[in-house]
Regions:
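Negatively charged, low-complexity tracts enriched in Asp/Glu with abundant Ser/Thr
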Residues: 1-26
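Acidic, low-complexity, intrinsically disordered interaction modules
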Residues: 17-68
């Protein structure tokens, strides 16, 4: 599986892609310094001490905007 990883701060800047509000992401545990990853299918996962937790997903045509905004490619 390929991912793009980013901080919670970056994810919160891309809020229009998530279909979730900042409040919902914060309730899920996303903080500015959180480690978050997105799968190619658009699944959002938050890094916890011993695992990754699914917290939602991205909507629409997120691929180009995600790569452009993060400066990263799928790895």
């Amino acid at each position: 599986m390929q991912y793009i990883e980013m901080t919670g701060k970056t994810l919160l800047k891309l809020i229009d892609l998530t279909g979730l509000s900042q409040e919902e992401l914060r309730k899920a545990g996303v903080r500015d310094d959180s480690l978050v990853r997105v799968t190619r299918l658009g699944d959002l996962e938050l890094r916890k001490p011993h695992k990754w937790d699914a917290i939602g997903g991205l909507l629409g045509e997120f691929d180009h905007k995600l790569r452009h905004e993060t400066g990263l490619d799928w790895a």
